[in-house]
From Swiss-Prot:
Residues 1-227 are annotated as: Pyrophosphorylase. InterPro entries: Bifunctional_GlmU, GlmU-like, GlmU_C_LbH, Hexapep, Hexapep_transf_CS, MobA-like_NTP_Trfase, Nucleotide-diphossugar_trans, Trimer_LpxA-like_sf. Residues 228-248 are annotated as: Linker. This is Bifunctional protein GlmU. Homotrimer. Its cofactor is Mg(2+). Mg(2+) binds at D103, N225. It comes from Histophilus somni (strain 129Pt) (Haemophilus somnus). The gene is glmU. PANTHER family: BIFUNCTIONAL PROTEIN GLMU (PTHR43584:SF3), NUCLEOTIDYL TRANSFERASE (PTHR43584). It comes from the Bacteria. It is found in: Cytoplasm. Pathway: Nucleotide-sugar biosynthesis; UDP-N-acetyl-alpha-D-glucosamine biosynthesis; N-acetyl-alpha-D-glucosamine 1-phosphate from alpha-D-glucosamine 6-phosphate (route II): step 2/2; Nucleotide-sugar biosynthesis; UDP-N-acetyl-alpha-D-glucosamine biosynthesis; UDP-N-acetyl-alpha-D-glucosamine from N-acetyl-alpha-D-glucosamine 1-phosphate: step 1/1; Bacterial outer membrane biogenesis; LPS lipid A biosynthesis. It holds the Pfam family NTP_transf_3.
C-alpha cells in the first residue's frame, strides 16, 4: 500500500491566542503554522491533502488560495473524531491516511515516514512521546508492546498516572479501517464530543494491532494554544536552522540573534552579524559579510560582497565585490554589477548600476540604467514619476552627476557627460557635455542680518 493521503485538522478558533486571526494562520518563521504542515504533507507526496476548516474560513481560504488542498468544512467543532468524520467520504480503501494538526507545525517528513513504515496491516500506528511531566496528557496503555488504550488524565488510576508515554494525536491507518471505526464513534462523554482516541479501543475490539512509535524530538509534536507556546516553537525552529548553517560553515556573531524565514543557500566564509533577517529565497556567494540589522528577501548576492549595517535588500541582484550601506535600500528590480558602491541612505528601485559605478550618499535612483564607472553625487534624484506614469533615465558610461541634481525623466545622458552640482536636467545630454543650470552666485557686501524687534 503505497498510496497516501493526509488529513489536517485546522478548524479550531484558538481562543487563547486572543486574536481575530485563526490560530493556524499565526506564523512560525514568517509562514503560517498550517502552511508548514501542508509543506510537510507535500514532501510525503500525498495524493490528497484534506484540510478540515471551520473558524475563520474566509481568511484561511485567502491565505491558502494557492495550496493544493481539498477543503472540507466542519460546521461545528465536536472533537477530533467529528473532524475526521467530515473527511471520511473522501478516503479510499487501499490508501494510508495520516492524521495531522494545523497547530503542530514542526512535525517532520522523516518522523512521519518512520510512523508510516511501522503501520501494521489494517491496524494503527500512533505517534507518542515521553514527557518528564505528563500531567494533563492522555497516557498510552500497552500490553505486550501493543497499545490497548489511551487513558485521559482524569480517568487514569494511580498506576496509569505513573506512565510517561503520552499520545500526540498523530496517527496513520488505511482508509477502509478509518471509515469503519469513525462510523462507530459515539459522544458518550462529559464533553459530548467524538474523540479519535476511541479508535484505539475499537481497533483492539476488532483484534487489530495498534503500535506506538515514539517521536525523537519533543518539539516536533508540540502544539500551539497560546502566544507563549508560539514564541517557544519559533525560538526552537530558529535554533535548528542556525545549527544547520553553523555546521555548513556559516559564521554568526550571535546565533541566538538571527531569523531565517525562508531558504538560505551560501558559499564559503559567509559571516552574519546580529539581528539579521533572511526572508524568501536568498543566495549568498563566497566571502559575503552581512552587517547588523540587515534584512534580505528574495535576492542573490555574489562573491566578496560587503553589506553594511541596517541595509534592506529585496528582489535584487548584487554582483561581485559590491559594497552596500549602511542604511541602503535595494528595492525590487535593483541590479548592481561588480565593484559597485551604494552608500548610506541610498534607494535603488528597478534600476541597473554598471560596473565600478558609485551612488554613495542620500540618493534615489529609480527606473534607470546607469553605465560603467559613473559617479552619482550626494542627493541626486531621478524624477521618474509625473503623477500618472513612470519614465526611464538612461545614463551612459563615465558620467559624473554632481550633488543635489535632479534628473527629470524621460532622459538620456550620454557617456562622458558631466552634470554640475545643483542642476535640474530636463533635456537629453550629449557625450562629453557639461550641463549646469545653477543660479549665478551673488555677493552683497556689508550685509546686515535682520534683528528681532
Amino acid at each position: 500500500m503505497n498510496k497516501l493521503s493526509v488529513v489536517i485538522l485546522a478548524a479550531g478558533k484558538g481562543t487563547r491566542m486572543y486574536s481575530d486571526l485563526p490560530k493556524v494562520l499565526h506564523k512560525i518563521a514568517g509562514k503560517p503554522m498550517v502552511k508548514h504542515v501542508i509543506d510537510t504533507a507535500k514532501k510525503l507526496s500525498a495524493a490528497q491533502i484534506h484540510l478540515i476548516y471551520g473558524h475563520g474560513a474566509d481568511l484561511l481560504k485567502q491565505h491558502l488560495a494557492d495550496e493544493p488542498v481539498n477543503w472540507v468544512f466542519q460546521s461545528e467543532q465536536l472533537g477530533t473524531g467529528h473532524a475526521m468524520q467530515q473527511a471520511a467520504p473522501f478516503f479510499q480503501d487501499d490508501e494510508n491516511i495520516v492524521m495531522l494538526y494545523g497547530d503542530v507545525p514542526l512535525i517532520s517528513k522523516e518522523t512521519l515516514e518512520c510512523l508510516i513504515s511501522q503501520k501494521p496491516e489494517n491496524g494503527i500506528a500512533l505517534l507518542t512521546v515521553n514527557l518528564d511531566n505528563p500531567t494533563g496528557y492522555g497516557r498510552v496503555i500497552r500490553e505486550n508492546g501493543t497499545v490497548t488504550a489511551i487513558v485521559e488524565q482524569k480517568d487514569a488510576n494511580p498506576e496509569q498516572l505513573k506512565i510517561t508515554e503520552v499520545n500526540t494525536g498523530v496517527m496513520v491507518s488505511d482508509g477502509a479501517s478509518f471509515r469503519k471505526w469513525l462510523a462507530r464513534l459515539d459522544n458518550n462523554n462529559a464533553q459530548g464530543e467524538y474523540y479519535m482516541t476511541d479508535v484505539i479501543g475499537l481497533a483492539n475490539q476488532d483484534g487489530l494491532k495498534v503500535v506506538a512509535v515514539q517521536a525523537k524530538d519533543l518539539m516536533e509534536v508540540e502544539g500551539v494554544n497560546n502566544r507563549l507556546q508560539l514564541a517557544n516553537l519559533e525560538r526552537h525552529f530558529q535554533r535548528k536552522q542556525v545549527e544547520k548553517l553553523l555546521l555548513a560553515g556559516v559564521t554568526f556573531a550571535d546565533p541566538a540573534r538571527f531569523d531565517l524565514r525562508g531558504e538560505l543557500t551560501h558559499g564559503k566564509d559567509v559571516e552574519i552579524d546580529i539581528n539579521v533577517i533572511i526572508e524568501g529565497t536568498v543566495r549568498l556567494g563566497n566571502n559575503v559579510f552581512i552587517g547588523a540589522g540587515c534584512v534580505l528577501k528574495n535576492c542573490t548576492i555574489a562573491d566578496n560582497v560587503e553589506i553594511k549595517p541596517y541595509s534592506v535588500i529585496e528582489d535584487a541582484i548584487v554582483g561581485n565585490n559590491a559594497k552596500i550601506g549602511p542604511f541602503s535600500r535595494l528595492r525590487p528590480g535593483a541590479e548592481l554589477s561588480e565593484n559597485t558602491h551604494v552608500g548610506n541612505f541610498v534607494e535603488i528601485k528597478k534600476a541597473q548600476i554598471g560596473k565600478g559605478s558609485k551612488v554613495n550618499h542620500l540618493s534615489y535612483i529609480g527606473d534607470a540604467e546607469v553605465g560603467h564607472h559613473c559617479n552619482i553625487g550626494a542627493g541626486v534624484i531621478t524624477c521618474n514619476y509625473d503623477g500618472a506614469n513612470k519614465f526611464k533615465t538612461l545614463i551612459g558610461d563615465n558620467v559624473f552627476v554632481g550633488s543635489d541634481s535632479q534628473l527629470v525623466a524621460p532622459l538620456t545622458i550620454a557617456s562622458g557627460a558631466t552634470i554640475g552640482a545643483g542642476t535640474t536636467v530636463t533635456k537629453d545630454v550629449q557625450e562629453n557635455e557639461l550641463v549646469i543650470t545653477r543660479v549665478p552666485q551673488r555677493h552683497i557686501s556689508n550685509w546686515q542680518r535682520p534683528k528681532r524687534k
